[in-house]
Amino acid sequence: MALRLEDKKAIVAEVNEAAKGALSAVVADSRGVTVGAMTTLRKTARANGVYVRVVRNTLARRAVEGTAFECLNEVFTGPTLIAFSNEHPGAAARLLKDFAKEQAKFEVKGAAFEGNFIPAADIDRLAKLPTYEEALAQLMMTMKEASAGKFVRTLAALRDQKQEAA
């Protein structure tokens, strides 16, 4: 179906606006995925703060022009689904990686984070980034373990001191 020039400009503007506010982007090939599965993906994406759109390659190239996601131009081949993470950098990568496990024909092509291209083979690095809450919990656990260890060492030093005095 041919798109009018106004429609193309609207799509480019919409995707460009999503790209400007996004933390990361993931590009995938959704050929062979059923409509029902894509609908489920879109619902899950909305719930996780991820913008998902199937875009023509030329429109996608124009939309990411001048953004941190220009490095994705090389993977804009074939049918292109682009997902932008708005709340957490790993949200889109995690979402599409999990979806690819369920759908054999769904293929992640690559991702971009802070202007750097991440090949599909390394998408786990982005998907495994902890959320803000998880990172805080890890920091608190580290601090808690460090203070507990310091307390134990202080008690051991006090014990050794008393044994030497006796």
Curated annotation (Swiss-Prot):
**MF annotations from Gene Ontology:** large ribosomal subunit rRNA binding; structural constituent of ribosome
Could you tell me which CDD domains the record lists for this protein? Ribosomal_L10
Q: Which SUPFAM superfamilies match?
A: Ribosomal protein L10-like (SSF160369)
The question of whether Transcription is a record keyword is answered with: no
As for family, the record states: Belongs to the universal ribosomal protein uL10 family.
Q: Which NCBIfam families match?
A: PRK00099.1-1
Q: What is this protein called?
A: Large ribosomal subunit protein uL10
Q: Which organism is it from?
A: Shewanella amazonensis (strain ATCC BAA-1098 / SB2B)
Q: What is the lineage of its organism?
A: Bacteria, Pseudomonadati, Pseudomonadota, Gammaproteobacteria, Alteromonadales
